[in-house]
A protein has these predicted regions:
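General zinc-binding finger modules coordinated by cysteine/histidine
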Residues: 85-218
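Short cysteine-rich clusters marking metal-coordination/redox-active sites
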Residues: 9-12, 25-26, 34, 50-53, ...
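Cytosolic, low-complexity regulatory segments enriched in Ser/Pro/Gly with interspersed Lys/Arg
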Residues: 55-57
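Cys/His-coordinated zinc-finger cores
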Residues: 32-47, 128
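Proximal pre-RING flanking segment of RING-type E3 ubiquitin ligases
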Residues: 1-26
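Ubiquitin/ubiquitin-like proteostasis machinery centered on ERAD and p97/Cdc48
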Residues: 59-102
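Short, non-ligating residues that shape and space the ligands of small metal-coordination modules
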Residues: 18-22, 35, 43, 59-60, ...
Length: 218
């Protein structure tokens, strides 16, 4: 690994920085994945393995201490010392100041316009609609591997464009079933719906025409 690579996260390529992304280490010894990526892997994707060696990690410790090793800490249940907080969902230990300033912010259901907070995503979505006439995408909320604070909000015209074509960041729109007129998060979701709820023609199959679906056999 080059010196430049060692200064950036193995997954997102953002630099390690005490206030934003700190190094994490597991019992395997690898420390090249940042706190945000590890938190996303473990709490949202439910992937508890090391991104480098794939070893399953019961716990991960995030620290801005230079050269910190897993063996430097003694774990007593959910405690490794007064300076750290245990995040139960991800089974990660964070320094208290970092957990308050960054981790809690990522999980907060906070309006990006008026800064009011709500109890859950449903209430936040209702708040945007009622107070700001803006939309959150339910398909993205249910399927996108993102923290609540990373979910986008849209003006009505932009929301329709988001559904049909996607966003300027290169993300695709949500494809619509031509029979049900219902949208799905991505092409995989649409394909699974078509295969489960609609019909193929055995004559088309024999002719080598694949992935052609019909509303019914009439």
């Amino acid at each position: 690994m080059s010196e430049e690579e060692d200064l950036t996260c193995f997954l997102c390529a953002f630099p390690f920085e005490a206030s934003q992304r700190v190094r994490c280490v597991g019992v395997c010894g690898h420390n090249n994945v940042c706190s945000i990526c590890f938190l996303r892997l473990r709490s949202i994707q439910r992937n508890f393995s090391c991104a480098s060696c794939k070893q399953q990690l019961d716990h991960v410790i995030c620290s801005d201490k230079v050269g910190a090793q897993f063996s430097d800490f003694t774990i007593w249940g959910d405690n490794i010392g007064p300076d750290y907080i245990y995040d139960e969902k991800s089974q990660m230990f964070f320094q208290k100041a970092y957990h308050i300033s960054k981790v809690e912010t990522l999980w907060a259901f906070k309006c990006g316009i008026c800064k009011q907070t709500r109890r859950d995503m449903k209430q936040l979505k209702q708040h945007y609609q009622a107070e700001h006439n803006m939309q959150m995408c339910e398909l993205c909320i249910e399927n996108k591997q993102a923290f609540p604070s990373e979910q986008k909000v849209y003006k009505q015209s932009d929301y329709e464009n988001h559904l049909r074509k996607g966003d300027q960041d290169g993300s695709e729109g949500h494809p619509k079933c031509e029979f049900c007129r219902k949208r799905y998060y991505d092409k995989t979701g649409l394909f699974m719906h078509l295969a489960r709820d609609h019909f193929t023609c055995h004559l088309c199959d024999r002719a080598g025409i694949q992935f052609k679906y019909y509303a019914d056999y009439k």
